[in-house]
Amino acid sequence: SQVQTGFGRLGSHFWGFQTHDVLPDIVTMGKPIGDGHPLAAVVTTREVTDSFNNGMEYFNTFGGNPVSCAVGLAVLDVIEGQDLRGNALSVGNYLMDAFRAMQARYEVIGDVRGMGLFLGIELVTDRKTKAPATEFARAVSNGARRRGVLMGTEGPHDNILKMRPPMIFSKRDADHLLAVLEETFADVARTLG
C-alpha cells in the first residue's frame, strides 16, 4: 500500500516500495492521490490484470469518474510542479538532524527513524533494553496537541511518536514543530521525572 508512503512523502523516491528495490504485482493507493477528495486506485501487472479476463470482470460503480480523475491529475501536477518530493527530502533531513540532536539531550529518546516526511521518535525508559516509555509518549502527544501540534503514538506499546506532516511542510513549519517538541519534552520530563 502506498497510502502513507507514496507520492514522494519519503523524499528519495516517488513510491515507498522503491526504497526496497522491488516491483510489486499489486499497488494500492488512496488518500494522498485525492488530497482530500475521495479517490483511490489499484495498479497491477499485466499478468494480474489478465487473470480477471475469465468471464468474471471487475466492476466498480465509480471507477474512472472524470471529476475524481481530474482531481488526481491536478494533485500529481502540484507534487511535480512544486517539487514536493524534494521538499519532503530537504525538510525531512532537517527534522531528522534536529531529532538526533534532541536524542543526545533526552535519554528517553531511544531511536529516531524515518525518511522524508514520514518520521518517528521511539521513546524508551531504558536505551539498552528499549523498554517502552508509553506514558511519556502519550504525555508528549497530548502536550503537543495542547500547543497546537498533532502527532500520534504508534507501535505495539504506543511509544513511538509518529509524524506525517503535509507535503508542503516548510523549514519554518519544522522550526515550529521543533520548538513545540522541545517545550513539551522539557515539561513532560519535569512532570514524569
For the regions a protein language model found, what residue spans apply to each?
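Conserved N-terminal phosphate-binding loop of PLP-dependent enzymes in the Aspartate aminotransferase
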Residues: 2-193
